[in-house]
């Protein structure tokens, strides 16, 4: 990460991050043992990986973008430190989101920063970041959906550049989601194949729940699957409890942004954990492809 946050402090990065966390805790309710243990775990990983400056940078960026209503998306919702800093409204302890999904000692790259701004505020956000951090280039991500990134090194960026740490931050503009459905249509699947093949993402076989999926789809004759059947799939394939299904239902109704974001991350993690085969997860492509070819365009597809 090459952005230089304008922070007024003399202590080292990790000490300053600890101080900011303690400051956020003052005046609040006493921490539970579970909360203390989670903070200790996250700070231990942050210290071992020497990434405190990244979290300070995220905090600094958000302080500048609050005026345009920006929020952070992505795996940041798995971090209790980010929650304490006010960077996300999602309490990962409430939703059972593991920090290891956001960052761990085995990761070779830094977590990517997804900044989402309300419709019509993208240019304001780009201007603020350009002026604040003296960035000279704003690059569209090749094959991206209205995504922009900052780089003083490259004239254009690819997805691969993100994983080479040439990417500073995504800036995305909120898109209106008009359609909620689960599709099993072959035509939709072919479109998904084309979509991912353009990004060199393989849809090869790497799942462990084929028989369960096939049984569910044979019972529905391969027709569209609606919400109640989706919860049944979650319970049967992923072992999701009734309580968790209720959280899914609330989140998918778009009643709360933080619920929706947290459930996405839980779902994403659970699939990885169970080996059910999450192939890709793209916020503004509105596409999930999970398990077998049968479950397609899961959760968000804008059909306009």
Across the structure, where does each feature detected by a protein language model lie?
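Alpha-helical scaffold/interaction cores of sigma-54-like transcription cofactors
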Residues: 1-304
């Amino acid at each position: 990460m090459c952005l230089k946050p304008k922070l007024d402090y003399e202590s080292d990065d990790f000490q300053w991050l600890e101080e900011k966390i303690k400051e956020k805790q003052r005046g609040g309710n006493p921490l539970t043992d579970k909360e203390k243990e989670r903070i200790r775990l996250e700070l231990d990983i942050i210290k071992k990986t020497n990434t405190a400056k990244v979290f300070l940078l995220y905090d600094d960026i958000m302080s500048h973008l609050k005026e345009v209503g920006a929020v952070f998306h992505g795996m940041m919702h798995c971090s209790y430190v980010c929650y304490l800093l006010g960077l996300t409204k999602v309490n990962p302890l409430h939703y059972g989101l593991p920090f290891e999904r956001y960052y761990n000692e085995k990761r070779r790259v830094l977590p990517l920063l997804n900044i989402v701004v309300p419709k019509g505020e993208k240019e304001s956000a780009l201007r603020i970041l350009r002026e604040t951090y003296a960035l000279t280039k704003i690059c569209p991500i090749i094959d991206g959906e209205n995504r922009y990134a900052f780089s003083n090194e490259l004239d254009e960026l690819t997805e691969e550049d993100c994983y080479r740490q040439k990417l500073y931050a995504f800036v995305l503009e909120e898109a209106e989601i008009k359609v909620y459905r689960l599709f099993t249509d072959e035509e939709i699947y072919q479109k998904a194949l084309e979509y991912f093949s353009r990004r060199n993402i393989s849809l090869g076989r790497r799942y462990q729940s084929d028989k369960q999926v096939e049984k569910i789809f044979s019972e529905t004759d391969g027709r569209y699957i609606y919400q109640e059947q989706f919860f049944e799939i979650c319970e049967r394939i992923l072992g999701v409890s009734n309580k968790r299904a209720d959280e899914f239902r609330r989140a998918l109704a778009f009643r709360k942004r933080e619920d929706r974001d947290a459930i996405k991350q839980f779902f994403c993690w659970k699939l990885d954990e169970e080996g059910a085969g999450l192939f890709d997860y793209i916020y503004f492509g509105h596409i999930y492809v999970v398990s077998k070819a049968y479950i397609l365009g899961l959760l968000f597809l804008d059909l306009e």
